[in-house]
Curated annotation (Swiss-Prot):
The active site is at 65, 138. It comes from Cucurbita pepo (Vegetable marrow). Signal peptide: none annotated. GO terms for biological process: hydrogen peroxide catabolic process; response to hydrogen peroxide. The keyword Heme applies. This is Catalase isozyme 2. It catalyses: 2 H2O2 = O2 + 2 H2O. Belongs to the catalase family. Homotetramer. One of its GO terms (molecular function) is catalase activity.
Length: 492
């Protein structure tokens, strides 16, 4: 469907305003009343329609990633990866695919400043010839918890206090004190990269492990990495306070104005891959979202480039109604990553809540390739259909099964149970390695930020001691520094 054909504001270039039903309006500045000073008439359909439309303009904001900005462009394959995936949009170097990208903060509300310390979202929708592929990630390569059952809780812990609506560090420090696997995420969160200078200078990571399948049916685990060609840049607290105090939409403005000026943001896509049969040969768990795949063990491989060269035409239509739902295409599949599998339900479900069951009919979300199924009717269904057969199979309809494409061939066995990921030996190691890789001044800023969080008056001695113990296990000198600032003794 061509979205521009149905725009009531300019589709037919009418010289005057009309009602939603198309009737001409001869006075759009005064209500219908009994005389000049009399009461308004209930029959003033024009007023009722105008007010009713206004009071319904807002839709539910996203439960996470509410604050965001979008832009359009293309993805181009630059390196041959046909040995890894049979995905059509990755078939050969030079192939271009239209995309729309949404950047966001994670925790804060729709109108919050873009200078807050918060993970950033980096979501890409590829409009491929075989359907849409949604690659939804963050600017950190890891997450705070490894099991999907804990996802709602960690988000609530970072959200404002439900009683006061104040965001308080004691809440997420309390929750994450039960999760030492969160250390590496905190080593990103309280690092300098915790406040990107804008969206153009921000990395992106798929976080979870997906699966790539080639034409021969060989499957590999894969992680995706977006690297900005203009480099990674961040803001320190003083600059964030100054910038946020004068412009709470600085990153959105920077993205929009850069594209308008022809300074198109660009990222390079890299992947890491692990053969399915080699998953258990590493000392880390490849399906654990709280750890990173070491690049010296699993090297990066270049794939392509992402260029954003067009601003969106309407913020509501192409940002607020833009919906990512973990869509897949042949050649790319989910892995057994517990967080990824839960997200495959959560993303689509929250879009049904925000936008209705037919959210994929909205122009920004609809595939650009031919598509057909028997998903009929429902709220806000605006697709015109005149077929008589809405079931499958039928001898009156030529629709048939598509050609079979390869799927991950893993064979599963085990008993039904609730259990934890067994390999937890990297809870502390990678966080310590990251801390030790920083220059002394960067280490000092990290210590100051974490000590400030621990200094919340509602953080108990027990929680403080737990965190000092965690950081001591990551790096003894780091634990000692935090303990010294808190007038406590580090315990192993």
């Amino acid at each position: 469907m061509d979205p521009y054909k149905y725009r009531p504001s300019s589709a037919y270039n009418t010289p005057f305003c009309t009602t939603n039903s198309g009737a001409p309006i001869w006075n759009n500045t005064a209500v219908m009343s009994v005389g000049e000073r009399g009461p308004i008439l209930l029959e003033d359909y024009q007023l009722i329609e105008k007010i009713a439309t206004f009071t319904r303009e807002r839709i539910p904001e996203r439960v996470v990633h509410a604050r965001g900005a979008s832009a359009k462009g293309f993805f181009e394959v630059t390196h041959d990866v046909s040995d890894l995936s049979c995905a059509d949009f990755l078939r050969a170097p030079g192939v271009q695919t239209p995309v729309i990208v949404r950047f966001s903060t994670v925790i804060h509300e729709r109108v919050s400043p873009e200078t807050v310390r918060d993970p950033r979202g980096f979501a890409v929708k590829f409009y491929t010839r075989e359907g849409n592929f949604d690659l939804v990630g963050n600017n950190f390569p890891v997450f705070f918890v490894r099991d999907a059952m804990q996802f709602p809780d960690v988000i609530r812990a970072f959200k404002p206090n439900p009683k006061s609506h104040l965001q308080e560090s004691w809440r997420f420090l309390d929750f994450c004190s039960y999760h030492p696997e969160s250390l590496l995420s905190f080593a990103w969160f309280y690092d300098d990269v915790g406040i990107p200078i804008n969206y153009r200078h921000m990395e992106g990571f798929g976080v979870q492990a997906y699966s790539l399948i080639n034409k021969a049916g060989k499957a590999r685990l894969v992680k995706f990495h977006w690297k900005p060609t203009c480099g990674v840049k961040s803001m320190l607290e003083e600059e964030a306070i100054r910038v946020g105090g004068s412009n709470h939409s600085h990153a959105t403005q920077d993205l929009y104005e850069s594209i308008a000026a022809g300074n198109f943001p660009e990222w390079r896509l890299y992947i890491q891959t692990i053969d399915y049969e080699d998953q258990n040969n590493y000392d880390f768990e490849p399906l654990d979202t709280t750890i990173a795949w070491p690049e010296d063990v699993v090297p990066l491989r270049p794939v392509g480039r992402l260029v954003l060269n067009k601003n969106i035409d309407n913020f509501f239509a192409e940002n607020e109604m833009l919906a990512f739902s973990m869509s897949l295409v042949p050649g790319i599949h989910y892995s057994d990553d517990k967080m990824l599998q839960a997200r495959s339900f959560a993303y689509a479900d929250t879009q049904r809540h925000r936008l209705g069951p037919n959210y994929l009919q909205l122009p920004v979300n609809a595939p650009k390739c031919p598509h057909h199924n028997n998903h009929h009717e429902g709220f806000m269904n605006f697709m015109h259909r005149d077929e008589e057969v809405n079931y499958f199979p039928s001898r009156y309809d030529a629709c048939r099964h598509a050609e079979k494409y390869p799927m991950p061939p893993n064979v599963l066995s085990g008993k039904r149970e609730r259990c934890v990921i067994p390999k937890e030996n990297h809870n502390f190691k990678q966080a310590g390695d990251r801390y030790r890789s920083w220059a002394p001044d960067r280490q000092e800023r990290f210590v100051n930020r974490f000590v400030e969080a621990l200094s919340d008056s509602k953080v108990t001695h027990e929680v403080r001691n737990i965190w000092i113990s965690y950081w001591t296990q990551a790096d003894r000198s780091l634990g000692q520094k935090i303990a010294s600032r808190m007038n406590a003794r580090p315990n192993m």
